[in-house]
From Swiss-Prot:
Protein known as: Shikimate kinase
Family under the similarity heading: Belongs to the shikimate kinase family.
Residues engaged in binding Mg(2+): S15
A molecular function GO annotation: magnesium ion binding
Chief location bin: cytoplasm
Sites where the protein binds ATP: G11, C12, G13, K14, S15, T16, R120, R158
Alphabetic keyword roster: Amino-acid biosynthesis, Aromatic amino acid biosynthesis, ATP-binding, Cytoplasm, Kinase, Magnesium, Metal-binding, Nucleotide-binding, Transferase
Cofactor note: Binds 1 Mg(2+) ion per subunit.
Pathway(s) it belongs to: Metabolic intermediate biosynthesis; chorismate biosynthesis; chorismate from D-erythrose 4-phosphate and phosphoenolpyruvate: step 5/7
Named cofactor requirement(s): Mg(2+)
Binding site for substrate: D33, R57, G80, R142
Organism from which the protein derives: Flavobacterium johnsoniae (strain ATCC 17061 / DSM 2064 / JCM 8514 / BCRC 14874 / CCUG 350202 / NBRC 14942 / NCIMB 11054 / UW101)
Amino acid sequence: MEKIVLLGYMGCGKSTIAQNLSKITQIPFLDLDICIEKRANLSIKEIFEQHGEIYFRKLEHEMFLELLQSSENAIIGLGGGTPCYANNHLLLQRDDIVSVYLKASIDTLYNRLVHNKSKRPLIANMDEEEMKEFIAKHLFDRSFYYNHAQHKVAVDNRTIDETVQDILDILA
């Protein structure tokens, strides 16, 4: 059983990198948020609106545990906040998984997120300064949890293929 867990801030490339890694390794990619949506039969936005964040974080933790305990191989892409709640950061250090923090700078994240702000409700109405401040605060708050990953891969000034290769080197 092989579990590869990718984590990092929104815009760091978790989904794109996981999809490419999946094609190369033939290990299925499971996006935690999509798994939660299928289970709840609601979008993440609807879960937050109808049940609140505490309920969502409980569902998220349960689904993460379920994916880790599955006998299937998987590349699991976490939501940006997943490691920060319900002691999920401790699960990143289990012996039976490989956890990788895709580390990006504030400028890299800003440049990636600014073009599709409308798809990200948290930042949709922010100007450049507000957005950079928001990202910086979140990165500061979350770095403790993100840094529990067994491996860190810098994504600044790296192509998707280069980042995937960095992860393949870790897995070798």
